């Protein structure tokens, strides 16, 4: 495997971001790392989140010789990026909720952010709103249950629409015309979300913007992705997880996504160098 793009998330949500990156860079190699032993991240204390993510990602970068890291998790991106960039010597890309494009797109100037409780309460999120959506009424909806519903859907192919409708009731009542999906798990539920909310609500996520950023960094940095080394059929795909075991359904989903290797990784001590 050549220097891969390493995509990281707490669970399978980052696959939505990985899919967008692969559209732009289909011949590159990829490592997908999901810390499902600590899922969902939205309920972790900030210091625990930072130390665990930095330790795990650093370990995988050293092992795989990744050329860039994509933190495909909104909750982690709000707090982990400074420490991770200080630790690593390769580009690190995070996820920014699509507040700015939502504010520009909204005709009613009533927009919403659907994210984990951790993302909703972070100062970073409120700064984004103040900076880019000051002319809008912004409703914030924090929900970790949707993360687990997305995980369940990927693992089993099933999703409880009745429960989803209950969860989204406040969103429906808010009378929005644009809803930002502020968790990378939520695009996995896009069809069901649209079904409940109706076509009058536009759903926005950050996947395409992240892919563009990765492409730009690789093309203009030392790790050039656009060369003959990558002009081959397909790419090598490896996945790593932290939980003791994963379901057969999830393993099948990952295989269907193109992952040829699936391996559990034991995290090192967060204080180790």
UniProtKB/Swiss-Prot annotation:
Keyword entries, A-Z: Cell shape, Cell wall biogenesis/degradation, Isomerase, Peptidoglycan synthesis
InterPro entries: Asp/Glu/hydantoin_racemase (IPR015942), Asp/Glu_race (IPR001920), Asp/Glu_racemase_AS_1 (IPR018187), Asp/Glu_racemase_AS_2 (IPR033134), Glu_race (IPR004391)
Active-site residues, as the UniProt record annotates them: 73, 183
BP GO annotations: cell wall organization; peptidoglycan biosynthetic process; regulation of cell shape
Catalytic activity: L-glutamate = D-glutamate
Positions that bind substrate: 9-10, 41-42, 74-75, 184-185
Keyword Endoplasmic reticulum: no
Enzyme Commission (EC) number: 5.1.1.3
Enzyme class (EC, first level): isomerase
A Pfam short name: Asp_Glu_race
Biological or metabolic pathway of the protein: Cell wall biogenesis; peptidoglycan biosynthesis
UniProt key word Repeat: no
Primary role: Provides the (R)-glutamate required for cell wall biosynthesis.
Family assignment from sequence similarity: Belongs to the aspartate/glutamate racemases family.
HAMAP family named among the record's database cross-references: Glu_racemase
Name of the molecule in the record: Glutamate racemase
Lineage: Bacteria, Pseudomonadati, Pseudomonadota, Gammaproteobacteria, Alteromonadales
């Amino acid at each position: 495997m050549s220097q891969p793009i390493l995509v990281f998330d707490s669970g399978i949500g980052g696959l939505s971001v990985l899919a967008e990156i692969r559209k732009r860079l289909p011949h590159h190699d990829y490592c997908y790392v999901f810390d499902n032993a600590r899922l969902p991240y939205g309920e972790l204390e900030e210091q625990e989140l930072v130390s665990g993510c930095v330790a795990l990602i650093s370990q995988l970068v050293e092992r795989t010789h990744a050329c860039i890291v994509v933190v495909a998790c909104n909750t982690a991106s709000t707090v982990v990026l400074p420490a991770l960039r200080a630790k690593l010597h390769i580009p690190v890309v995070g996820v920014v909720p699509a507040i700015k494009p939502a504010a520009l797109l909204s005709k009613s100037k009533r927009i919403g952010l659907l994210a984990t409780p951790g993302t909703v309460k972070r100062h970073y999120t409120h700064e984004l709103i103040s900076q880019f959506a000051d002319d809008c009424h912004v409703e914030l909806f924090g929900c970790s249950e949707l993360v687990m519903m997305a995980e369940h859907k990927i693992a089993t192919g099933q999703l409880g629409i009745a429960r989803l409708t209950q969860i989204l009731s406040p969103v429906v009542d808010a009378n929005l015309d644009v809803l930002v999906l502020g968790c990378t798990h939520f695009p996995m539920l896009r069809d069901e979300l649209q079904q409940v909310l109706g076509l009058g609500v536009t759903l926005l996520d950050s996947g395409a913007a992240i892919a563009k950023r990765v492409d730009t960094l690789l093309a203009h940095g030392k790790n050039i992705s656009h060369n003959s080394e990558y002009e081959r059929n397909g790419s090598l795909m490896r996945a790593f997880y932290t939980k003791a075991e994963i379901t057969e359904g999830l393993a099948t989903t990952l295989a269907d996504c193109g992952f040829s290797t699936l391996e559990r990784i034991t995290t090192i001590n967060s204080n180790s160098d």
